[in-house]
Amino acid sequence: MPNEFTSAKLRSDCSRTSLQWYTQTQHKMRRPSLLLKDILKCMLVVFGVWLLYILKLNYTAEECDMKKLNYVDPARIKRAHRNTQEVFQKECRPGHAKKTMDLLFKGKYSMDLEPFVQKIPTASEAELKYDPPFGFRKFSSKVQSLLDMLPEHDFPEHLRAKHCKRCVVIGNGGILHGLELGHALNQFDVVIRLNSAPIEGYSEHVGNKTTIRMTYPEGAPLSDAEYYANDLFVAVLFKSVDFKWLQAMVKNESLPFWIRLFFWKQVAEKIPLQPKHFRILNPVIIKETAFDILQYSEPQSRFWGHDKNIPTIGIIAIVLATHLCDEVSLAGFGYDLSQPRTPLHYFDSQCMGAMNWQVMHNVTTETQFLQKLIKEGVVQDLSGGIH
């Protein structure tokens, strides 16, 4: 006959068995539930991509008024040339861009920030705080592997040695067409071009000198003709496959087909430059530009959509220029959204209205930022597109 102890033990064992059975049953029930959630997420993503593709195919915006691209007000041409002449008529002011940025954005702009990622034993705390493009959290080993392939990590010595450097950041705006600023733009010490903006066929208006080509994989020119032997290719890294793409470009290797599937458009198969001409943009520049200067919200984990907290390549390039050069000028910047049928770029027929469809950038905030830089004399707007 069982005593109290054995009875309690039997009850305990039975309870434990029941609990184990219940827990195992719950786990089994939860697994299909989690699997179902994952399947639903994948289906939503596929449906979303399909929907965006259909909308893109069926979006019939008004055709651009190409007459506006072909006709340029003579007064605007004169004004652009006068703006450029004024830059070179004055004596270059050493440290002007950094000093004025520091005064304008006190505590938000680091005067001693390295423009490019350096090969050092440990990355800075700021570099590792965020995921790309604002930092290299979880990617430090990949960055170090890339840096091991690059023989140089600084601005070229002949440019660093120059007492006072003048930069021009050339945007891709349709406003450049017809201004015939090419010769004047070639006079700057440092010429920064963005993404795939072509020179061939447009040099009369945009010049043919390039010091820096700043872009991300999908934005890099596909044609070898757009690269010159002494260009610096400054890579902006946004996602994991961007590191693999850059590694392939530096090593002059082909990128596997399956990796290409992760890019939203065709990427260059080769970059005809030597490894010493590649640089990696310091992500802290993007972080400071976005969160400190433009006051965008920090990245949040989201299943769908964007926070509009990523600055355009053009804005990032302007901030980079203030770290590289003593004086900074702009050409080809400015979005006139009140003229949706005006050509957006100097090299294609895409309309200004397309900017209303993009979901990554805050055009209004960026325009206000540029207006502030011009008003305070940090930069000079040569083409007059920023109102």
Swiss-Prot record:
Its EC number is 2.4.3.9. The keyword Cell wall biogenesis/degradation does not apply. It comes from the Eukaryota. Residues 1-33 are cytoplasmic. InterPro entries: Glyco_trans_29, Glycosyltransferase_29, GT29-like_sf, Sialyl_trans. Keywords: Disulfide bond, Glycoprotein, Glycosyltransferase, Golgi apparatus, Lipid metabolism, Membrane, Signal-anchor, Transferase, Transmembrane, Transmembrane helix. It catalyses: a beta-D-Gal-(1->4)-beta-D-Glc-(1<->1)-Cer(d18:1(4E)) + CMP-N-acetyl-beta-neuraminate = a ganglioside GM3 (d18:1(4E)) + CMP + H(+); ganglioside GA2 (d18:1(4E)/18:0) + CMP-N-acetyl-beta-neuraminate = ganglioside GM2 (d18:1(4E)/18:0) + CMP + H(+); a beta-D-Gal-(1<->1')-ceramide + CMP-N-acetyl-beta-neuraminate = N-acetyl-alpha-neuraminosyl-(2->3)-beta-D-galactosyl-(1<->1')-ceramide + CMP + H(+); ganglioside GA1 (d18:1(4E)/18:0) + CMP-N-acetyl-beta-neuraminate = ganglioside GM1 (d18:1(4E)/18:0) + CMP + H(+). GO terms for biological process: lipid metabolic process; protein glycosylation. GO terms for cellular component: Golgi membrane. It is found in: Golgi apparatus membrane. Its main location: Golgi. Disulfide bonds join 167-325. Transfers the sialyl group (N-acetyl-alpha-neuraminyl or NeuAc) from CMP-NeuAc to the non-reducing terminal galactose (Gal) of glycosphingolipids forming gangliosides (important molecules involved in the regulation of multiple cellular processes, including cell proliferation and differentiation, apoptosis, embryogenesis, development, and oncogenesis). This is Lactosylceramide alpha-2,3-sialyltransferase. The gene is St3gal5.
